[in-house]
A protein has these predicted regions:
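Short glycine-biased active-site loop of nucleotidyltransferases that positions the nucleotide triphosphate
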Residues: 87-91
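Short, solvent-exposed loop/turn elements at beta->coil junctions and helix N-caps
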Residues: 6-9, 82-86
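N-terminal presequence-like segments and the immediate start of the first folded domain
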Residues: 1-33, 71, 75, 92-105
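Short, well-ordered alpha-helical segments
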Residues: 21, 26, 34-81
Length: 105
């Protein structure tokens, strides 16, 4: 499966557009990570506890998007993007989305 943020894939022709595919995940930091991350935020800089939650959510959302694309018979996803929104205090929604296509050489 080819996944790109671009709208075309060099060396391939798009033979069919299958529609939008997406994967969505809502993740909470959890009490321990939330407390440690909250304390670290006072000092500033990168907060590894929150970074871990965000990266895990992106991977999970990507995997769900990929499964959706395979389910509808795509062999590529173009225009792939991530979006995230704070869902509630301590919870974040991560959305991975793109256009599922069939490519041919």
């Amino acid at each position: 499966m080819i996944i790109t943020t671009g709208n075309e894939v060099a060396g391939y022709e798009i033979v069919e557009y299958l529609g939008i595919v997406r994967g969505i995940v809502v993740r909470a930091t959890g009490i321990r990570r939330g407390l440690v991350g909250g304390l670290k935020s006072i000092a500033g800089g990168n907060i590894e506890e929150f970074t871990h939650v965000c990266e895990t959510a992106r991977i999970e959302a990507s995997n769900r998007m990929l499964a959706h694309a395979k389910q509808i018979g795509a062999n590529a996803i173009i225009g792939m993007r991530y979006d995230s929104t704070e869902f509630s205090q301590g919870s974040t929604e991560v959305l991975a989305y793109g256009t599922a296509v069939r490519l041919s050489k």
